[in-house]
Amino acid sequence: MGDRMAFRFDSGATWLNLLATRGTHFGEHPVERMPTVGRLVEWLDAVELRPVRKVSAADLELAWELREALRPVALATVDGVPPDSAQVKALGRFLDGESVSLKVTDRLVRTPPATATDALGRIARQAVDHLTGPEREFLSVCPEHDCRGVFSDPSGRRRWCPNPACATRGRVRAHRARKAQSE
């Protein structure tokens, strides 16, 4: 599987990594990294949220729906503007559901979600906590017009999302602009 299809787990939170399952979202050729139920299961495994029950095509549709409900709310939060009420309502429907129980083995662990819907609910709750709490101040958006990926940057020093392609394109463009000015 090519690098373009590889999952990204470097955005700073599970819900931000869910946003990254669709690359170059605003470009002419977006990259869907989670096109199948199998890929959704792989992603849920990687974020330790694989449900007990089998994941279905309807669950994949719900995962896409959550991702695309989160994106505009996150971008509005970073831009410091109120999100559209319809977007908030779309996100809100994921917040109902099971509660998380914890157990102790050799470490503190949460019980696996019963269904993919429950897993998506946990992700939605994490996102809402992040978007409404003090950590929202650490959210940044990649300036690349085709990316606009949201990521957490507690250091305040990142200019681009964790995708190396965005930083490379941005640096090359800046270098060419400086070179053109000096000529």
Short names for language-model regions:
Residues 141-146, 163-165:
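Short, cysteine/histidine-rich loop/knuckle motifs that typically chelate Zn2+
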Residues 138-140, 157, 176:
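A structural preference for long, well-packed, hydrophobic secondary-structure segments
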